[in-house]
Amino acid sequence: MATRVVVGTQWGDEGKGKYIDMLAKDSDMVVRFSGGNNAGHTIVANGVKYALHLIPSGILNEGKTCIIGNGVVVDPAVLLKEIKELNEKGISTDRLLISDRAHVIMPYHKLLDELQEKFRGENSIGTTKRGIGPCYSDKTERSGIRMCDLVDEDEFVRKVRENLKVKNLIIEKVYGGQKLDEEQVISEYLEYGRKLKEYVADVNSIIFEAIEQGKNILFEGAQATFLDLDFGTYPYVTSSNPVAGGVCTGAGVGPVFINEVYGVLKAYTSRVGAGPFPTEQNNEIGDRIRELGWEYGTTTGRPRRCGWLDLVMIKYAARVNGLTALAINHVDTIGKLPKIKLCVAYKKNGQETRNFPCSLKELAQCEPVYEEFDGWDEDISNVKSFDDLPDNAKKYLSRIEEIVGVKIKLIGVGKEREQTIVVN
């Protein structure tokens, strides 16, 4: 049995989907354990581009059981759209399952998300306005609606009527918005429930049964360490726990059953939306990285902020997630720059540190300490082994391993999943 977890080590968009898709080939089951459709995986397989926001990337591998775990919040309309688009491209969703414990994103969640962000004004946190945060808030408040409720029509109607009494008051009286039509919400969502009923199951039992049978299971992370509600750059974070520990609560799997944890990173750093970014290059270098790496959000289309790779962050991510391996992307991209910088420490009040601070005020006082490397402006897209990489690339990658203290096992040298070096 092998149970692997794949997590992002930065602010998301590291290219996790590519490695999840690759590792899924050796897995019997792929499980998504956190987040919602505010995250997106883009995979290019056999020349076809797939953008997935809820369904596990493993769906592209025939015969794999793909599970949306209880830690995920589900927008039924988005999920049904993804199912339809996959089916139209010849991809079967017969082996897709959704946890009966997963919470449902309702129209009032999306409306409140938008109204709250508008209310914050210049203090906005850059939410995607897809209702993720308000849905998780209801989950914590114990007023949420779960998939088991969505497919139980009487229970669903009761809960919606109860919730809308409060939600419509908040929408109207606090934010000055227009209240939602109760009957329209009920009618729309009952239809979603009927269409999704065949996919809803007690997936926790199914996962545990697979573990007992010695099956290979891949746990697919969305977003990343520095967007984690507890360990990220709070409050510029998501509303869930995308770190490896999120598997335990988001899929109902005890830590003793986790064998390997892969941390995915880019050879540089990017971020969407507001929040701190110590190595950001708000200049021609940042613009060049953005264009070379085509750094625009899968979900929002927003241009990403770009900068140098920050190993203080990666080392912190290695500790928080218990990483056993690194998987690095865009090695081909960063090498096109003549000079490359690598942040190996921070300097604060004249003192060097390799610890990532909790306080954003303290983080703002930290200056990156850089080491400089020469680029390798040559085509490496067909390189199949570490030894065949340019010397400058090998120096760069070896320094990353040395400082982080975790071996690089997968190296991305292009967009296709075949353009990956597996390091033994």
UniProtKB/Swiss-Prot annotation:
Enzyme class name: ligase
HAMAP family associated with the record: Adenylosucc_synth (MF_00011)
Molecular function, one GO term: adenylosuccinate synthase activity
Family stated for the protein in its record: Belongs to the adenylosuccinate synthetase family.
Taxonomic source organism: Acetivibrio thermocellus (strain ATCC 27405 / DSM 1237 / JCM 9322 / NBRC 103400 / NCIMB 10682 / NRRL B-4536 / VPI 7372)
Binding site for Mg(2+): D13, G40
Entry function: Plays an important role in the de novo pathway of purine nucleotide biosynthesis. Catalyzes the first committed step in the biosynthesis of AMP from IMP.
Gene name of the record: purA
Cofactor binding mode and count: Binds 1 Mg(2+) ion per subunit.
Amino acids binding IMP: D13, E14, G15, K16, N38, A39, G40, H41, T128, R142, Q223, T238, R302
Associated pathway: Purine metabolism; AMP biosynthesis via de novo pathway; AMP from IMP: step 1/2
Residues given in the record as GTP binding sites: 12-18, 40-42, 304, 330-332, 412-414
Name the record gives this protein: Adenylosuccinate synthetase
The reaction(s) this protein catalyses: IMP + L-aspartate + GTP = N(6)-(1,2-dicarboxyethyl)-AMP + GDP + phosphate + 2 H(+)
